[in-house]
């Protein structure tokens, strides 16, 4: 959902009289409840639609039942020889968008004033007025990919993460890690563990970070408009359509060059 989160606004800009609805948790349960285990890191992966689209002024509502035609990511125009065109652009081309009409496609989130206030309070409590980073280490750091069956490159992943964290060894990090921090082959300055924080607040806090770094995932994708994001590539050297031109994708060949951007 994160990588297409600008779509409601872009549709309204091009077609001012259109209505934009997204499926509710109930609708997603009806459609995909039998495969929800594919998203093993989430207690309920269908809640993500609310994490991304709540309070969005361009969304006309969440619907529980889908009685008419549904436009989804199979409706897209793509170049089979260039698979790394962002998915949202492929979908918008189906809607007759020209390139200049979808330049501002980077993910966006609309927080409530209450969410902003609560997020600022957490930042103030744990980081004060100092800069801080965001760290996200998921189960894609090590082990075997459930989708491809291939082993993740732990050696390269470790080298990449260590390189960034050693450069910013004095920077405190708000973090989420799949395992306990001490179980990883790297260390960092811990500011606050966000594991049990409301996801919308996590996203807000990450949006205020000096930068975010970690394994490639939608949570970091969601805040790349607001905070520089560095993510370990999932499909090097053949990126897929779940890319964003605002992200910095890290691999064993480019991570030192990318690190010097900050």
Locate predicted features.
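Catalytic machinery of carbohydrate-active enzymes
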Residues: 1-262
């Amino acid at each position: 959902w994160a990588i297409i989160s600008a779509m409601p606004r872009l549709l309204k800009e091009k077609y001012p009289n259109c209505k934009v609805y997204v499926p509710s948790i109930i609708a997603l349960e009806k459609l995909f409840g039998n495969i929800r285990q594919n998203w093993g890191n989430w207690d309920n992966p269908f809640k993500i639609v609310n994490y991304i689209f709540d309070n969005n002024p361009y969304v006309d509502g969440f619907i529980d039942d889908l009685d008419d035609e549904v436009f989804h990511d199979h409706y897209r125009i793509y170049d089979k020889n260039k698979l790394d065109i962002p998915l949202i652009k492929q979908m918008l081309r189906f809607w007759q968008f020209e390139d200049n009409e979808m330049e501002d496609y980077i993910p966006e989130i609309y927080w409530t004033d209450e969410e902003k206030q609560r997020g600022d309070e957490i930042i103030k409590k744990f980081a004060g007025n100092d800069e801080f980073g965001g760290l996200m280490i998921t189960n894609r750091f090590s082990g075997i990919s459930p989708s491809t069956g291939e082993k993740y490159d732990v050696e390269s992943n470790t080298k990449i993460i260590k390189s960034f964290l050693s450069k910013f060894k004095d920077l405190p990090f708000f973090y989420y890690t799949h395992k306990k921090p001490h179980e990883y082959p790297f260390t960092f300055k811990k500011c606050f563990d966000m594991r049990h924080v409301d996801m919308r607040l996590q996203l807000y806090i990450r949006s205020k970070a000096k930068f975010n770094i970690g394994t490639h995932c939608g949570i970091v994708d969601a805040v790349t408009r607001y905070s520089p994001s560095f993510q370990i590539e999932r499909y090097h050297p053949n990126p897929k359509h779940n890319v964003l031109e605002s992200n910095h994708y890290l691999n064993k060949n480019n991570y030192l060059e990318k690190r010097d951007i900050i």
